[in-house]
């Protein structure tokens, strides 16, 4: 299991609930791999379950 979840777009991968996933592009773990979500982040709200707040969110960049 890759802690960064760097699998191909549309691919599948295993992601633990504590996964930090900075490159969550695969469909099987996309919704559980967003580790941060600042207020007003539209992209996070559309496809990621937020696990904390941060000013720097990889899925919002």
UniProtKB/Swiss-Prot annotation:
It comes from Sus scrofa. One of its GO terms (biological process) is intracellular zinc ion homeostasis. Keywords: Acetylation, Metal-binding, Metal-thiolate cluster. The modification N-acetylmethionine is found at residue 1. PANTHER family: METALLOTHIONEIN, METALLOTHIONEIN-1G. InterPro entries: Metalthion_dom_sf, Metalthion_dom_sf_vert, Metalthion_vert, Metalthion_vert_metal_BS. Pfam families: Metallothio (PF00131). Belongs to the metallothionein superfamily. Type 1 family. A divalent metal cation 7 binds at residues 50, 57, 59-60. Metallothioneins have a high content of cysteine residues that bind various heavy metals; these proteins are transcriptionally regulated by both heavy metals and glucocorticoids. A divalent metal cation 5 binds at residues 34, 36-37, 50. A divalent metal cation 2 binds at residues 7, 13, 15, 26. It comes from the Eukaryota. The keyword Endoplasmic reticulum does not apply. PROSITE patterns: METALLOTHIONEIN_VRT. Class I metallothioneins contain 2 metal-binding domains: four divalent ions are chelated within cluster A of the alpha domain and are coordinated via cysteinyl thiolate bridges to 11 cysteine ligands. Cluster B, the corresponding region within the beta domain, can ligate three divalent ions to 9 cysteines. Coiled coil: none annotated. GO terms for molecular function: metal ion binding; zinc ion binding. Residues 30-61 are annotated as: Alpha. This is Metallothionein-1E. Residues 1-29 are annotated as: Beta. One of its GO terms (cellular component) is nucleus. Monomer.
């Amino acid at each position: 299991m890759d802690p960064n979840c760097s699998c191909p777009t549309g691919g599948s991968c295993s992601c633990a609930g504590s996964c930090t996933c900075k490159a969550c592009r695969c469909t099987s773990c996309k919704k559980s791999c967003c580790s941060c979500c600042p207020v007003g982040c539209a992209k996070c709200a559309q496809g990621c379950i937020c696990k904390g707040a941060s000013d720097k969110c990889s899925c919002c960049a």
